[in-house]
Amino acid sequence: MSGNENHIYIAIDLKSFYASVECRERDLDPLTTNLVVADAERTEKTICLAVSPSLKVYGIPGRARLFEVVQRVKEVNQERSQKLPKRMFEGSSCFSDELKEHPELSVTYVTAKPRMALYMKYSTQIYDIYLRYIAPEDMHVYSIDEVFMDVTHYLNTYHMTAKELASKMILDVMQETGITATAGIGTNLYLCKVAMDIVAKHVAPDANGVRVAELDEMTYRKLLWSHRPLTDFWRVGHGYRKKLEEAGLYTMGDIARCSIGEERDYYNEELLYKMFGINAELLIDHAWGYEPVTIADIRGYKPETNSIGSGQVLHCPYDFEKTKLIVREMTDALVLDLVEKKLVTDQIVLDIGYDIENLTNPDIRKKYHGEVKADRYGRFVPKHAHGTANLDTKTSSTAKIMDAVLDLYERIVDKNLLVRRVSVTANRVVDEHMVSNETEFTQMDLFTDYQALAEKQKAEQARMEKERRLQNVTLAIQDRYGKNA
């Protein structure tokens, strides 16, 4: 039995968060409006950040590509038109309740361009609502739309059950922001997450439309040991599912039974460790409904190494020089991020992913003689470029980091190929005060002009101070007028 048996956790997930925000901004009902959040100015291959619940009813997944939405809505309209006397629509609507009442209307939807700053604003407002009830040290923000809470010591204070407390917070969020949410309650972090992700979808909503589900280790085994597919469970991806099913394990109950098999049996713990290595331990714990990690453990965790970075998929293939401008912009933004967080680094990593057109365009293809790899969609592309630049000292200097990145770019990127993905990462990141407090010792010799060296170091120090002032001014302007100022 885990050490969390006396704990009570709540997980809250904001329903179709991005789509709900866009609906509220338009004074539309998030539950009945057909809306997708996607940048239609790119291509129809762009991924939708969110799909509203009423569109999901048609079988459109939450992370569909825009062309999949277009195709599915077209199919739905073909099906609807077949039932009409003249097989012709008299109008259209993006509202599910109106579409149910009027079969003569075709299905349409609103396409909203993503606005991350707006979503962050809503998320912060909602987090502030949670803070009215729960102290920050008892919360873990899992993502922009999901949070975990340890409410063990709050229930007696508020004279509420965990379900009543979860419902109260969700109702406050709905009344103040218009965003609906779902909650899961469990005796550990895993169980509250699974209760929210799987069980809450099938429970009846309360009078305010709030869905809350509860699990402990025994009800988890009773309700979910036979649940399929395995990918519905936290931390089980398609790769895990494929491996498990190839071994004849289709449910969490199968995994739990496998873990207690004897050494002479085919199905035993060793089989799982052969498939997943040390990660099998977590999978076995979760199969039984165990999770030893607490929110206090998460908040107290200090990683051995830190990194900070960003990546982007370009909306169309870029040539060498255009991509270089993107790399320059991303590096500049990365350095400002380091300065804002008072961090320094001595290692930069650059990743460049090439576009499929490099192999489909005959003129480019004949110039390329390098390695070819299949991407995650099974398409063949030139092998991506990856490189690391090590700096002499830990720094947040724009000049030093930019020189290192651009030199790396020139060395590793094929000038003849078109680029589709770029990522820039600062590794081995530490607090700048840790570096400033370190004392450096230099071995002196008879041949160095130490006066000239001191003057050079003084000039470099002055340049660095001037650069830092400029960086701070840039950050102040961005803080006031936005990142694009």
Where are these regions (language model features)?
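DNA-contacting surface of Y-family translesion DNA polymerases
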Residues: 2, 11, 232, 238-419, ...
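Residues at or immediately flanking beta-strands
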Residues: 180-182, 349, 423
